Amino acid sequence: MDPFSFRTFSKDGIEIRSSIIDSKDEYMNVAYEILHRLLFQFAKLSMKAYRPRKNAYNLPYMYSERRLDSVVTPALSDICDGLVLTEMPAVRKKSKKRIKSKHGRVDYWCIFKGYTFVIEMKGSHDRFDCETVREYSLIRRWGKMIEQLNEVAEDCELMEEKTKGVIRLGLHFVSSWSPKVFSNKRVEEYREGCDCDLNVICDSLATCCNTAGGAPTYAAVWLIPDKMVYWKDATYPGVMLIAKAFEDIKHKPSDE
C-alpha cells in the first residue's frame, strides 16, 4: 500500500499525529472525521484517569482490550448523534422474510453526520523498543476484525434507520510500551519516528492479512504527555489508532 502522509494536530494539551486524507468520497471524509474526533476524545477521557494526588493511575490503554470499552463508548457518545449502542445484533430489520443472522453482534452502533456506523474494535500492545513485526497479536487480531466486518456486509443492507448508508468501521488501538524505563531522549526518538512506525505497521497489516479488504485507511498516534509516559518500571509513549473504513452500503428498500 502507498505510505500515509501525516501532520500534527494539537488541542487542549493533546497532541496527535494523524494521516492526511485526500478523497472525493463523502463516506470516507465522514469516516475520517469520526476517527479524528474519536482519538481526541479518547485521549481527553484517558487523561482524566491520571490522578497522582489520589494515587490513581488506572489508564485504560495499559490494560486488556475490554478495558478500552470504558473509554471508547463515552467517547463515541460525546461525538455521535444520539445514543451509542454496544453489542448490537447485526440484523434488526423487521420483514415478512425473517432472516436469521449467523454473524452475532457488532461492538458499536451509532449515527454520525447522517451515516450509520457499525464498528468492531480490537486492542493490542506493541513493544516500541523491538524491531520485530507484530505478527502474532496485532496482525492476527486485525485480520479477525476485518473478517467480522466482511461477514456483516449483507446484514448492513437490512438496517432500517433512514440514513445515507452504513459504514463498516474497524478500530485497532495499539498501545506502545516497553517493560523498561527509557530516557527522555528515547521517548523523543519514538515521537520523531512515529510516522515511519505507523507506515511500517500498516504495510505489514496490508501485506500479511489474508482477509479481503485488509489494508488500513487511517493511522494516527496520540503522543502521551511527558507526565504520563512512565508508570512504575514501564514506558508508555503513545497510543496508535489504525482503522479501516469500508465503502458505505446503501439500505435496501423495505419489502413489507
Task: Describe the predicted segments one by one.
Residues 76-102, 107-111:
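A short acidic/basic microdomain associated with nuclease active sites
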Residues 123-189:
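Catalytic cores of nucleic-acid endonucleases
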Residues 65, 87, 120:
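Acidic-residue sensor for enzyme active/binding pockets
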Residues 120, 130-132, 252-256:
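Short, charged, solvent-exposed linker or helix-capping segments at domain edges/interfaces
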Residues 161-256:
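Glycine-rich, aromatic-bearing surface loops/beta-hairpins
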Residues 108-129:
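Conserved catalytic cores of phosphodiester-cleaving nucleases, focusing on short active-site segments
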Residues 1-79:
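Interdomain/boundary linker segments immediately adjacent to catalytic/signaling cores
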Residues 31-44, 135-156, 187-208:
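Well-ordered, non-membrane alpha-helical segments in soluble/globular domains
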